[in-house]
Amino acid sequence: MRFLSTDMKDRNMLFAAIPSICASSPKKISIYNEEMIVARCFIGFLIFSRKSLGKTFKETLDGRIESIQEELLQFFNPNEVIPEESNEQQRLLRISLRICSTVVESLPTARCAPKCEKTVQALLCRNLNVKSATLLNATSSRRIRLQDDIVTGFHFSVSERFVSGSTFKASTIDLIREGLIVLRKVRVGGSI
């Protein structure tokens, strides 16, 4: 086995650590008890597996990052039904941004000062992004409110059916079926 310079340093560190762990008796005989052997093995393991452990941790973290990104993509479902008004508002914002950029290009000061043009465009883009984020937050809050209303309604209907003295008693299977129908409608984006 070939040792590189870093491997030699690691090996020298291991051999330097062994005497500091070993206890000597008065007769100059090394005493190796179980703790000493475990400590030596652990130090050797750390020194010689440092590179492979680093790669393992990096691969683990990279895998976790990928899974988090996949989970985030699931939240931004392209099949989600977005209200017509939000689509229309986004379209109008894009058009106004294009119009503003053409107006800025036609201004004589924009020809003289390209920095001004970039600043105005950056400001318009930032305003567009803020309005877009506000619109997405409003859409998201509407969806959350709808889900809360569905859950509340389902809880109310279940508790109403199991109240003592109620004349209408539904079986558990019927309740589960109703719940699944409601969930399917919510996932598809249909109305309830």
Swiss-Prot record:
**Coarse class of the protein's main subcellular location:** mitochondrion
Q: Name one GO cellular component term.
A: proton-transporting ATP synthase complex
| Keywords of the record | ATP synthesis, CF(0), Hydrogen ion transport, Ion transport, Membrane, Mitochondrion, Transmembrane, Transmembrane helix, Transport
What Pfam family is a match, any one? Answer: Mt_ATP-synt_B
Task: From the Swiss-Prot or TrEMBL record, state where the protein is found.
Answer: Mitochondrion membrane
Give the residue spans that cross the bilayer: 29-49
- GO BP annotations listed: proton motive force-driven ATP synthesis
Q: Which GO terms label this protein's molecular function in UniProt?
A: proton transmembrane transporter activity
Q: How does it sit in the membrane?
A: Single-pass membrane protein
PANTHER family the record matches: ATP SYNTHASE PROTEIN MI25, ATP SYNTHASE PROTEIN MI25-RELATED
Briefly, what is this protein's role?
This is one of the chains of the nonenzymatic component (CF(0) subunit) of the mitochondrial ATPase complex.
* Quaternary data: F-type ATPases have 2 components, CF(1) - the catalytic core - and CF(0) - the membrane proton channel. CF(1) has five subunits: alpha(3), beta(3), gamma(1), delta(1), epsilon(1). CF(0) has three main subunits: a, b and c.
Record family assignment: Belongs to the ATPase protein MI25 family.
* Name of the protein in its database record: ATP synthase protein MI25
Organism listed in the record: Triticum aestivum
